[in-house]
Amino acid sequence: MIKSELIARLANENPHLTQKDVERVVGVILERMIGALEDGGRVELRGFGALSVRSRPARTGRNPRTGEAVDVRAKHVPFFKSGKELRARLNADGDE
């Protein structure tokens, strides 16, 4: 599912809200989550999972085409850890 599909579904399931309103709400939620991660925080959605930022150190990589050594800079990457409830639902054997 992509962002536009999520917005369309939420708008269809909540007829009292316009698609524009849903779009705005989803946009604000995502911006707040990104802002928290930018500030070095963690975003936790109980039952779903937690987003955080991890640091990757600088390293020497290889160009797969030429085999030449390439310096890769240190960087920050988003990290997602799924929650227990999400893992349980994904691994349920159809008994729910």
From Swiss-Prot:
Keywords on record: DNA recombination, DNA-binding, Transcription, Transcription regulation, Translation regulation
PROSITE patterns given in the database record: HISTONE_LIKE
GO MF entries: DNA binding; structural constituent of chromatin
GO BP terms in the entry: DNA recombination; regulation of DNA-templated transcription; regulation of translation
SUPFAM superfamilies: IHF-like DNA-binding proteins
GTP-binding recorded as keyword: no
CC per GO annotation: chromosome; cytosol
Domain of life: Bacteria
UniProt xrefs under Gene3D superfamilies: IHF-like DNA-binding proteins
Coiled coil: none
Function: This protein is one of the two subunits of integration host factor, a specific DNA-binding protein that functions in genetic recombination as well as in transcriptional and translational control.
Oligomeric and partner information: Heterodimer of an alpha and a beta chain.
Protein name per UniProt: Integration host factor subunit beta
Organism per entry: Caulobacter vibrioides (strain NA1000 / CB15N)
